[in-house]
């Protein structure tokens, strides 16, 4: 299973924002309830915590609250949302949360509340439905600067057209402002306001499900590669890094304040820069000896030296986007890697003693039994300790959507997407239903490594082996 995703929010930086001038405001950020693995083992909504921290840096009289629907049962969630009183409510949404996100404005009694919607679920869908649901502003791209400017604009009745990275209605016409530039220096972003999150609950859930307390953080943003199923509209293709000292500062907070035993880096590609990884490992060995951590990698960006150094510095897990053991499928997905590179990476991972994980995609149009057999053979030969299985989902805005949208079922509505565990393609696209393929690969993994599967780590779509 992929592990993953402080008070020090007054970090001094060079960004200058306009000063706020008017009276007290209450701002509530919401992560809606959703479906899928994160409802089973939720991760802190760090994106919302970054937004809160960006506001709190410049103003201490704001009342800010973060609500995570994943931590609440249905009745409690409805009670909390329907009784909210706030000047601004900001909602983040993935595609699987979007139907719930669209419902939130109708549940709020205060008709003067301004509603803001952002996140990966909203970027590439027509926005008319968002406005119809009650949202005043739609945000695109990184939001740390945008939320500060939007709050000032709402409070001081300034023109929204001067805030980059948003869209809104003016006289029934949509206005979309210029894109928000990426934040070049990630050290300029304050540490996420975890003090507004129920970190004790997140950590305790991970301890219960995984057997040890774990939490998540990021040390970079962006990915330069062009996988056809991936959307880079939020963080872009340019990779930007936090400094080693900034990373260590946040790690120490997690280890010391929240008593975690492991930190997982949710970076899209932790291993993109070898020198940075080696320097980071040197810093870890000096500042945090003996601490455990994990990360995501890409098979052609690692080598034996890097992995050995990572192991020496406390890395216990690395997950790779393998997707398939079939070169045909890899090429169709635009992965830009070779099967032999996958095998070599796992050979090194196993030699140095890091738990290696595979993200695998099932249900690719054109997938045959031979492709599935190749994936099973890759699993057998590579001996991953963890597998995470996903159906290929052609989300709007991705290249794979443009290539395969004519194969999507007529009943699929991405505004009401709840098929995270069901293929969105028509059944006639496949020789065998993807659900059966997924079971076949899972059963193969369990049977091949019988006796080594750790039931605590068989969560959602993830299955892992005992050490």
What are these model-predicted stretches?
Residues 11-24:
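Short, Lys/Arg-enriched N-terminal segments with co-localized hydrophobic residues
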Residues 25, 35, 163, 169-219:
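N-terminal [4Fe-4S]-dependent radical SAM core
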Residues 27-37, 167-170, 175-176, 355, ...:
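C-terminal accessory regions of radical SAM enzymes
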Residues 37-48:
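Glycine- and acidic-residue-enriched helix-capping/strand-helix junction motifs
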Residues 54-58, 63-185, 391, 397:
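Glycine-rich beta-alpha loop elements in corrinoid/cobalamin-binding modules
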Residues 70, 121, 266-273, 298-299, ...:
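Short, solvent-exposed turn/loop segments enriched in Gly/Ser/Thr/Pro and often Arg
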Residues 128-132, 306, 366-380:
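Catalytic cores of alpha/beta
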Residues 192-362, 377:
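Radical SAM [4Fe-4S] cluster-binding motif and immediate context
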């Amino acid at each position: 299973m992929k592990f993953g995703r402080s008070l020090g929010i007054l970090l001094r930086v060079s960004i200058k924002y306009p000063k706020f001038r008017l009276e007290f405001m209450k701002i509530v950020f919401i992560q809606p309830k959703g479906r899928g693995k994160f409802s089973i083992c939720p991760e802190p909504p760090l994106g919302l915590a970054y937004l809160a921290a960006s506001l709190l840096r410049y103003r201490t009289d704001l009342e800010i609250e973060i609500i995570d629907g994943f931590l609440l049962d249905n009745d409690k969630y409805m009670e909390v949302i329907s009784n909210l009183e706030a000047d601004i409510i900001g909602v983040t949404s993935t595609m699987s949360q979007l139907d719930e996100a669209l419902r939130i404005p109708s549940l709020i009694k205060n008709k003067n509340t301004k509603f803001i919607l952002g996140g990966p679920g909203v970027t590439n869908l027509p926005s008319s439905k968002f406005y119809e649901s009650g949202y005043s502003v739609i945000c695109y791209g990184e939001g740390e600067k945008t939320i500060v400017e939007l709050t000032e604009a709402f409070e001081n009745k300034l023109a929204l057209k001067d805030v980059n990275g948003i869209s809104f209605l003016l006289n029934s016409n949509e206005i979309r402002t210029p894109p928000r530039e990426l934040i070049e220096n990630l050290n300029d972003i304050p540490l996420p306001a975890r003090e507004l999150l129920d970190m004790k609950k997140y950590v305790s859930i991970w301890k219960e499900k995984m057997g040890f307390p774990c939490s998540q953080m990021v040390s970079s943003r962006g990915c330069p590669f062009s996988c056809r199923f991936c959307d880079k509209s939020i963080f872009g293709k340019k990779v930007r890094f936090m400094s080693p000292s900034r990373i260590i500062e946040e790690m120490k907070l997690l280890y010391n304040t929240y008593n975690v035993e492991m930190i997982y880096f949710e970076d899209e590609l932790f291993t993109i820069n070898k020198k940075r990884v080696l320097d980071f490992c040197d810093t870890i060995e000096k500042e945090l000896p003996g601490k455990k951590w994990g990360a995501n990698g890409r098979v052609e960006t690692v080598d034996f030296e890097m992995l050995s150094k990572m192991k020496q510095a406390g890395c216990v897990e690395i997950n790779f986007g393998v997707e398939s053991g079939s070169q045909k499928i890899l090429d169709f997905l635009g992965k830009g890697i070779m099967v032999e590179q996958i095998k070599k990476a796992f050979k090194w991972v196993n030699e140095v003693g890091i738990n290696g994980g595979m993200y695998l995609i099932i249900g690719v149009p054109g997938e045959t039994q031979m492709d599935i057999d190749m994936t099973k053979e890759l699993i057998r030969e590579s001996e991953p300790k963890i597998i995470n299985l996903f159906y290929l989902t052609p989300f709007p805005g991705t290249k794979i959507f443009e290539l395969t949208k004519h194969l999507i079922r007529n009943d699929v509505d991405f505004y009401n997407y709840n098929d995270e565990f069901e293929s969105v393609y028509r059944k006639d696209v496949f020789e065998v239903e993807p659900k059966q393929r997924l079971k076949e690969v899972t059963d193969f993994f369990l049977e091949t490594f019988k006796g080594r599967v750790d039931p605590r780590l068989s969560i959602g779509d993830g299955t892992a082996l005992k050490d």
